[in-house]
Amino acid sequence: MSDAHNAQLDWDEHGQPLSRSYGDVYFSRANGLEETRHVFLAHNQIIERCQALPAGGRLVIGETGFGTGLNFLCAWQAFAEHAPRDARLHFVSVEKFPLTQTDLQRALALWPELAPYAEQLLAQYRAIHPGFQRLLLDGGRVVLTLMIGDVLECLPQLDARIDAWFLDGFAPAKNPEMWTDSLFTELARLSAPGATLATFTSAGFVRRGLIAAGFAVQRVKGFGHKREMLAGPFQAEPAPRSAPWFARPTLAAGARQAVVIGAGLAGCATAASLAARGWRVTLLERHDDVAREASGNPQGVLYLKLSAHGTVLSRLIVAGFGHTRRLLERLQRGSDWDACGVLQLAFDAKEAERQNKLAAAFPDDLLHALPQTEAEARAGIGLPAGGLFYPDAGWVHPPALCRQLAQHPLIELRPYQEALSLSRQQERWCVEGQNGVLAEAPVLILACAAEIGRLLPEANLPLKRIRGQISRLPANESSSALRTVVCAEGYVAPARDDEHTLGASFDFHSDDLTPSVAEHAGNLELLREISQDLAERLDTQTLDPATLQGRAAFRCTSPDYLPLVGPLAAGQAFNQAYAVLAKDARQVPETPCPWLDGLYINSGHGSRGLITAPLSGELIAAWLEDEPLPLPREVAEACHPNRFMLRQLIRGTGSPT
């Protein structure tokens, strides 16, 4: 695919952008800033609603047509100036053709008044690929969820309650595919009680469609030369949400304290997302510091193993990659991470065919094919083939990311605290260790990989451990030519601290974490398959595997290779409540889900933890805070811990897989 998923723009004599595809302007030529304030802010009472927010309150705005981000920045400015300091703004917007960062910067330069907000947006506006993309701004106080794609495909996948709608986008005459009854029905489904809507158009079919969907809109004075526009409240009953087994548990009022077990990527990310929302978090770690197990490798690779068919896993990976990539901007490039790119070699005919399909399915700025000569020039070493290049990817020092995530005044890291048992007493979870209670709180998040099975055996979660070993190879002047991560069956990364990381093995049977000479030898063989040239530069022909340093750890994965992220039901009560599904899987009983109150899971990330674990922290926080989910509803449900009990019930099997 080319870069055609980005907006194709022309610029007029005043430096204002016009859409080449729709033949329409992005905002009023007279004064786009004042148009936004009149149409969307004033007629949704945004300033008044910000002023009325309670301490710790939240305003959720939904928008069709992100465009130049002008509406978002105006709403953010109003929120910053009028809302309580501990309030939060969630802004959810759909955009089929996002602007490039260069075009966005040029467009926003028209509004110097918004520069403090535009600068933050531009700093985070990277890896904006198809699907859901979450951007954290103003220290996490402002959350922007961009849905990149067609509005009628994105909105049905949104799980949110919207307080105010900015119904924007190109004019109905220019973009009739958007302005349909299907759109108005989705706006109604997503509206919170008391929601409002405003739009620049006063077209009769739009007004009639909105009224039919439950919006009591009226024609009011428009902006500038536009005589009329539409605005009004949502007055219908809110639509029911998910099936009960995927519904959001009710959280007891004031329960904004949590214990997180496990200070790897999943645990640190969960703690960070909760702390950003004002939660006090106790982070329990059985070792001396964060990232001492699977998250402790010197270099991990941001590698996107995708499908050309838009699978749930692919959508999770693209969304997670964007989120992690934006988080990495907080770290020190060169020592903590590097966006050096990742090259996946087309090492055989089957892989080459798979890569051709991927190159046709995804935009060039996410991945594109390189022939062998270009791949060698990009990598700086000789290669056996060309492959797919991911220009925004690279390597990460996972402990640095974990430390950054855990550094928050509301997070208390407690090392040398090994959890041995759990109990629920007086609406609080108690975590007990060898010498008594380690911590207690109304909410408990288990982010301790396969150890969840030991702490919660009755849940029968099908988590499994897979041993992996990396090898550390001393770099030399010749090997410093390597400029990108290169992958085949294994991977090798450019040097960090004068060492290349090489890996990684997969062992489904061993429980021994002592690095083995045999697996060092296996990793060296993986290196030779990646690049005989680099292997020779590193003198592997004379290198004794027994002299290599390395480390081994357990990956934690699930049977469907998706993580487990979200709340968990009590197994026996779940089976009783939904026994009818064993006879008819189409039934959706109204019985509320028998949740294990206050218990959440963030585990099973396998070898993709760098990509999926940080965004999963946001997903946990969204479940707890009843916020817009950062992932498509279908993806969030596919990652739900209850899915295994549900499958077991429907299939009538004894296995939860």
UniProtKB/Swiss-Prot annotation:
Main subcellular location: cytoplasm
Entry GO MF terms: flavin adenine dinucleotide binding; oxidoreductase activity, acting on the CH-NH group of donors; tRNA (5-methylaminomethyl-2-thiouridylate)(34)-methyltransferase activity
Keyword Transferase attributed: yes
Pfam families in the cross-refs: DAO (PF01266), Methyltransf_30 (PF05430)
UniProt key word Transcription regulation: no
Highest rank taxon of the organism: Bacteria
Gene Ontology cellular-component annotations: cytoplasm
EC number from the UniProt entry: 2.1.1.61, 1.5.-.-
Keywords for the protein's UniProt record, in alphabetical order: Cytoplasm, FAD, Flavoprotein, Methyltransferase, Multifunctional enzyme, Oxidoreductase, S-adenosyl-L-methionine, Transferase, tRNA processing
FAD-dependent cmnm(5)s(2)U34 oxidoreductase: annotated span: 261-657
Cofactor(s) the record lists: FAD
A GO BP annotation: methylation
Positions of region (tRNA (mnm(5)s(2)U34)-methyltransferase): 1-235
SUPFAM superfamilies: FAD/NAD(P)-binding domain, S-adenosyl-L-methionine-dependent methyltransferases
Compartments, as annotated in UniProt: Cytoplasm
Reaction equation(s) it catalyzes: 5-aminomethyl-2-thiouridine(34) in tRNA + S-adenosyl-L-methionine = 5-methylaminomethyl-2-thiouridine(34) in tRNA + S-adenosyl-L-homocysteine + H(+)
Function: Catalyzes the last two steps in the biosynthesis of 5-methylaminomethyl-2-thiouridine (mnm(5)s(2)U) at the wobble position (U34) in tRNA. Catalyzes the FAD-dependent demodification of cmnm(5)s(2)U34 to nm(5)s(2)U34, followed by the transfer of a methyl group from S-adenosyl-L-methionine to nm(5)s(2)U34, to form mnm(5)s(2)U34.
Family under the similarity heading: In the N-terminal section; belongs to the methyltransferase superfamily. tRNA (mnm(5)s(2)U34)-methyltransferase family.
PANTHER family hit by this protein: SARCOSINE DEHYDROGENASE-RELATED, TRNA 5-METHYLAMINOMETHYL-2-THIOURIDINE BIOSYNTHESIS BIFUNCTIONAL PROTEIN MNMC
Protein name: tRNA 5-methylaminomethyl-2-thiouridine biosynthesis bifunctional protein MnmC
Organism the protein comes from: Ectopseudomonas mendocina (strain ymp)
Higher taxonomy: Bacteria, Pseudomonadati, Pseudomonadota, Gammaproteobacteria, Pseudomonadales
